[in-house]
């Protein structure tokens, strides 16, 4: 498994619908970049200038919304993941 360092978070991207409400199938080129995912691993948190560690606000299993162009896409064990900083997470869903 991927173990993120510092304030980084590993997420599994949740794919969006491939059809519009009217039933039109969207090609890959017309799809928006996904902004929703499920947290699969969390780092230990960021370290402040005084050496104190701040624990992450998200946990494994959380569904999140993140910045559109945030993070680095990686492929591991046949699955695609996104590694991003906790500050790129905009909200937790539910």
Swiss-Prot record:
Q: Which CDD domains match?
A: cpn10
Q: Where in the cell is it found?
A: Cytoplasm
Q: Which InterPro entries match?
A: Chaperonin_GroES (IPR020818), Chaperonin_GroES_sf (IPR037124), Chaprnonin_Cpn10_CS (IPR018369), GroES-like_sf (IPR011032)
| Domain of life of the organism encoding this protein | Bacteria
Main localization (coarse): cytoplasm
Cystine pairs: none
The record's keywords, sorted A to Z, are: Chaperone, Cytoplasm
> What family classification does the UniProt entry report for this protein?
Belongs to the GroES chaperonin family.
This chain's protein is named Co-chaperonin GroES
Q: Which organism is it from?
A: Parageobacillus thermoglucosidasius (Geobacillus thermoglucosidasius)
């Amino acid at each position: 498994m991927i173990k993120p360092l510092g304030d980084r978070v590993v997420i599994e991207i949740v794919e969006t619908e491939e059809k519009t409400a009217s039933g039109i199938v969207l090609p890959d080129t017309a799809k928006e970049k996904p902004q929703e995912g499920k947290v699969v691993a969390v780092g230990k948190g960021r370290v402040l200038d005084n050496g104190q560690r701040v624990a992450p606000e998200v946990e494994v299993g959380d569904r999140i919304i993140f910045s559109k162009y945030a993070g680095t896409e990686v492929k591991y064990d046949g699955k695609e993941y996104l590694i991003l900083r906790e500050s790129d997470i905009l909200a937790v869903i539910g």
